[in-house]
A protein has these predicted regions:
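Short, basic/aromatic recognition patches
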Residues: 1-26
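A general structural signal for short secondary-structure junctions and capping/turn motifs
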Residues: 16-18, 63-65, 144-149
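Short beta-strand segments
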Residues: 22-59
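A generic structural signal for short beta-strands and their flanking turns/coil linkers
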Residues: 23, 40, 49-53, 67-71, ...
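A residue-level signal for conserved active-site and pocket-lining positions in enzyme catalytic cores
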Residues: 33, 104, 154-156
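A generic structural micro-feature
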Residues: 36, 94-98, 148
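Short, structured beta-strand-loop surface elements
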Residues: 59-118
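C-terminal edge-of-domain segments
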Residues: 109-177
C-alpha cells in the first residue's frame, strides 16, 4: 500500500490545519479537450462551518468550466531534505513533507450578492497582517461589479480528505529529534 500506513494522516483537524496554513491549492480538473488533466494553482479559503472552500479565478480559467464536476485539490505543507548525517550515517537520504488531497465538487456561483460575499471573505482573510488592511469596499461598487464580470467565483464541497505526512515516523527517535 502506498503511501505506507504510518505516513497516512486521517485526523481531519490536522488536515484542515495544513490547508489553513498553506492555502494555495494545485487543482487537478477534467479537461473536455482530452483525457489529460488541466492543473491550476488557486488560493482557497476553507469555511469549516459550511464545509466548503471558496475561491475565485479568471473567467477564462478552465476551472470556470467545471461546474458540477469533481476536482482534486492538492495542498503541500513544509518540506525539507533529511541528510544521513543527522543519524550518524545510519539511514539513506530522504525528503520530509506533508500534503493533503481533497476531492471536491465544484459549484460556480452566479449570484452577485454571493460573489461580493466571497470576495469580502477572501480579502478580509488574506489581508490579515497588513496594516492598513485593504477592503473590497475601497473600490466603488460599479468598478467591483465590472471586475466581477471578469472572474468566476467557486465553492468546492469536499467529498473526501486524505493526507500524507512523511515526517520520519518510521525512523528512530534520535533521527526524528
Amino acid at each position: 500500500m502506498y503511501p505506507p500506513t504510518h505516513f497516512q494522516e486521517h485526523n481531519i483537524e490536522r488536515l484542515q490545519a495544513l490547508v489553513e496554513q498553506f492555502p494555495l491549492a494545485s487543482i487537478l480538473m477534467p479537461c473536455s479537450q482530452s483525457d489529460l488533466n488541466n492543473i491550476c494553482q488557486v488560493p482557497v479559503l476553507y469555511e469549516s462551518s459550511r464545509n466548503v472552500f471558496i475561491a475565485h479565478v479568471a473567467k477564462h480559467n478552465p476551472l470556470a468550466q467545471c461546474d458540477k464536476q469533481s476536482v482534486k485539490l492538492l495542498f503541500s505543507g513544509d518540506n525539507c531534505y533529511l541528510s544521513p548525517s543527522y543519524s550518524n550515517n545510519k539511514t539513506l537520504p530522504s525528503w520530509l513533507y506533508s500534503s493533503v488531497q481533497v476531492t471536491a465538487n465544484v459549484n460556480i456561483i452566479e449570484s452577485d450578492n454571493e460573489k461580493d460575499k466571497i470576495m469580502r471573505q477572501l480579502t478580509s482573510h488574506f489581508e490579515q497582517g497588513f496594516t492598513p488592511m485593504w477592503k473590497i469596499t475601497d473600490v466603488p461598487k460599479s468598478n467591483r461589479q465590472a471586475m466581477y464580470q471578469q472572474l468566476s467565483f467557486i465553492e468546492f464541497t469536499p467529498t473526501h480528505w486524505s493526507g500524507n505526512f512523511k515526517l520520519s515516523q518510521n525512523k528512530s527517535p534520535e533521527v526524528r529529534a
